[in-house]
Amino acid sequence: MALGAAYHHYLQLAGDHGTATHALLLGVLIFLVIRLVSARRTGTTSANKRKQQQRLPLPPWPPGKLPIIGHLHLIGAETHISIRDLDAKHGRNGLLLLRIGAVPTLFVSSPSAADAVLRTQDHIFASRPPWMAAEIIRYGPSDVAFVPYGEYGRQGRKLLTTHMLSTKKVQSFRHGRQEEVRLVMDKIRAAATAAPPAAVDLSDLLSGYTNDVVSRAVLGASHRNQGRNRLFSELTEINVSLLAGFNLEDYFPPNMAMADVLLRLVSVKARRLNQRWNDVFDELIQEHVQSRPSGESEESEADFIHVLLSIQQEYGLTTDNLKAILVDMFEAGIETSYLTLEYGMAELINNRHVMEKLQTEVRTTMGSPDGKKLDMLAEEDLGSMPYLKATIKETLRLHPPAPFLLPHYSTADSEIDGYFVPAGTRVLVHAWALGRDRTTWEKPEEFMPERFVQEPGAVDVHMKGKDLRFIPFGSGRRICPGMNFGFATMEVMLANLMYHFDWEVPGSGAGVSMEESFGLTLRRKEKLLLVPRIAS
């Protein structure tokens, strides 16, 4: 029935009910007509937009694509450097498209392109691609970092930012962090007072420190019981190795013989690892259920497991959801803080003038009237140390723990800077290249914390994702929610290392190697061995 005929039909049904009914029916009809026309226009506009996008060129790609493997042969062992060089030669405006196996993969290396992916069009790019190892290790995945974007992911982020990683909650763990720093200082002091002073393995000490800080936050003061902290360190190390680099099993069709073999190998390792996480979490959750505190406030040092159990019903979380979120806490919390501290100390050793300037700031700020050194710098002492904060920022600029942000995934066709990006494209934002972009940074290869000190001529860069020149923690909907926890962990340790000790390279070495090993995170190849001396 046509709209006009329908209208007259309803008028007849209304009969003599008067002008009010007539007016009501007329209003309903007008509303329906407007909705219909609007829907048609919207549909036509969307269809036209899709056609226009599809007529755009794809982002530039290098020649030499081969059957089956695509451009994989162009990527060397130092993947972050290979991609930078390919982008410089074949990319445009920070966009480079490679086909890795069967999967189109877009590499993003400029602030404007990163802004499109992470902010202006993040509703399209906020999801994650299929990642078999992550799905097994993270229960589905049902964590926060790897889960495809949707309502569960939004609620998971809300849970973390509200209950587990808020500024207030991070501050509630400060006494635990400071106790862990004190233990490390005691070990270094013992080496420094030996005759002669002995070298310490800072890689081992800093890795153990960040592991213990996170373990303590997750399960409380019992984190060293039965060697649990060492077990968490081992499991996290296996996690990172399984997720390292390009997981080729996810880039080839599963019916290919090679892909099938890779899938089987990775699946067996991932399931074995998942079972080990299961065993330890089952035990810990049961202990926490039996010892659950009553009326505990978020201002107390309630550990993460207690917090998750207290809000489990509110958020409708399964036990597997709890476990997946805890895996996130270990992997992100341990690896990133440890690597940043190690790189920071390595850069300070190689740039003595920077270390001396930082030591002067820390020691002058914390000078006491009687000339006695403090036993320990506390977190509340660090607010007036801008060069300390600048040093950590500069370390994150040159050495972001993850050279590429976790992969994004386009869920719809889109356009970036005049190029067509089809749905189903994997997108890797090149955080390492952004931090070394010569069009953005003055002397980008040099370690210069001064660029972050807020003085005339300094670079005013927001670290928390608002400035796309510098995104060590990501940006937009998938920004890392643990940045406050990580920064607090790094800041108090670095301040105490600079306050209590002078540092030297063993033997006659003038500096340390910065040679790197690529993976999910970027690591130095060599252990950081340094000789401490008690600061005068």
UniProtKB/Swiss-Prot annotation:
Residue runs in coiled coils: none
Pathway membership, UniProt: Secondary metabolite biosynthesis; 2,4-dihydroxy-1,4-benzoxazin-3-one biosynthesis; 2,4-dihydroxy-1,4-benzoxazin-3-one from indoleglycerol phosphate: step 3/5
Compartments, record wording: Membrane
Pfam family, one: p450
Alphabetized UniProt keyword annotations: Heme, Iron, Membrane, Metal-binding, Monooxygenase, NAD, NADP, Oxidoreductase, Transmembrane, Transmembrane helix
Catalytically driven reaction(s): indolin-2-one + reduced [NADPH--hemoprotein reductase] + O2 = 3-hydroxyindolin-2-one + oxidized [NADPH--hemoprotein reductase] + H2O + H(+)
GO cellular component: membrane
Bilayer-crossing regions: 18-34
Protein's name according to its UniProt entry: Indolin-2-one monooxygenase
Lineage: Eukaryota, Viridiplantae, Streptophyta, Embryophyta, Tracheophyta
The gene coding this protein: CYP71C2
